[in-house]
Amino acid sequence: MQIKFWPQDLKLAHTWTIASSVTSGSDVTSVGIVQLTDRDGTVGLGEAAPARRYNESTPGSLDFIAKVDATKLSFDNIEASMKYVESLASGQFAAKSAINVALLDGAARKAGKPIYDLLGLGFRNNHHVTSFSIGIDKADVIRKKVLAAEQYPVLKLKVGAADDKANLAALREAAPQKWVRVDANEGWKTKEHALEMIEWLAQDKFIQYIEQPMPADSNPKDIAWLKARSPLPLFGDESYHTAKDVDHCAECYHGVNVKLCKTGGISNAYEALQVARKAGLKTMIGCMIETSILISAAAHLAELCDYLDIDGNLLTTNDPYLGVTAEKGLLSFASAPEKLGLRVRAK
């Protein structure tokens, strides 16, 4: 097996700001691309989309990948390959995700199947709907963003800043009755303030749920207190990394948001979704700012999800890959350039 890897800068259509970084909005982000090639010429693609929230970076991810001995990786034995990768260092979930996705891409190609069939899940084109994210911004910019996102039936509004009420009002001026999911990104610091904001949001009958209302390291009793009183469902994002977090999240939330960059890849995300479902939690799969490699990888798990928020590639202007599409928010592989593996190809 040979491995190649490189950084890829992604330009954002709008400056991206969320509650955990309200002072440092960005208009460019960087991801790491991984390409594995075996002796038969089978290629597997992967992507690392690290988050500063988890003390990871693209340079750090690529440094980790540089330490991987590709001769110890095999499309024919993903479990052993990942056991080796895990042994190299703790953490580094984004980098491990890139390798896991590339391994599954290659394995599915060799099996003559797309990944969703390799996993036994299948995929229904034009059935799953992704939300489209609106970052924290000035009210007039929010209005313009919402109008530009007219084709998407569901929006996700980032909150947790001083202008939350003005921003929701601006969204509603442009889209009075569109379904909205609200993501506080740990922005409400006390249970009382969080409940006050959620009760205000619940007056809007077209809001579906609230994501990560309080910091993940809050006292679990405070989050459970909030869950018991919240008029809207609560989803844990920063609180749910892997399947090991399920007991805590079952006490504190109604659902969880799984991301490949948090779990360490498709294999662990599959487990995290299955375990959450068995615990009675609603499930969603989310993303960071990513190319179509990682967005498509997440889409292969759609059949395990109640909700999807995989729009990271739609927020960029220079996605270098083609894969799953989201016309009018409906996910589809019907026009994907590849039939096997991730069903992704470079433009």
Swiss-Prot record:
Entry-linked InterPro entries: DgoD-like, Dipeptide_epimerase, Enolase-like_C_sf, Enolase-like_N, Enolase_C-like, Mandelate_racemase_C, Mandelate_racemase_N_dom
UniProt KW keywords: Isomerase, Magnesium, Metal-binding
Binding positions (Mg(2+)): 183, 211, 237
Record SMART domains: MR_MLE
Other facts: Part of a large, functionally divergent protein family. Protein modeling and substrate docking were used to predict the substrate specificity, prior to biochemical analysis.
Gene3D superfamilies: Enolase-like C-terminal domain (3.20.20.120), Enolase-like, N-terminal domain (3.30.390.10)
Cofactor note text: Binds 1 Mg(2+) ion per subunit.
Cofactor field: Mg(2+)
Function as written in the Swiss-Prot or TrEMBL entry: Dipeptide epimerase with a broad substrate specificity. Catalyzes the epimerization of L-Ala-L-Ala, L-Ala-L-Ser, L-Ala-L-Thr, L-Ala-L-Met, L-Ala-L-Phe, L-Ala-L-Tyr, L-Gly-L-Asp, L-Val-L-Asp, L-Val-L-Glu and L-Val-L-Phe (in vitro). Can also catalyze the epimerization of L-Ala-L-Glu, but with lower efficiency.
Similarity comment text for this entry: Belongs to the mandelate racemase/muconate lactonizing enzyme family.
Top-level taxonomy: Bacteria, Pseudomonadati, Verrucomicrobiota, Verrucomicrobiia, Limisphaerales
GO molecular function: metal ion binding; racemase and epimerase activity, acting on amino acids and derivatives
Protein name listed in UniProt: L-Ala-D/L-amino acid epimerase
Annotated residues for binding of substrate: 156-158, 259, 309-311
Organism (species): Pedosphaera parvula (strain Ellin514)
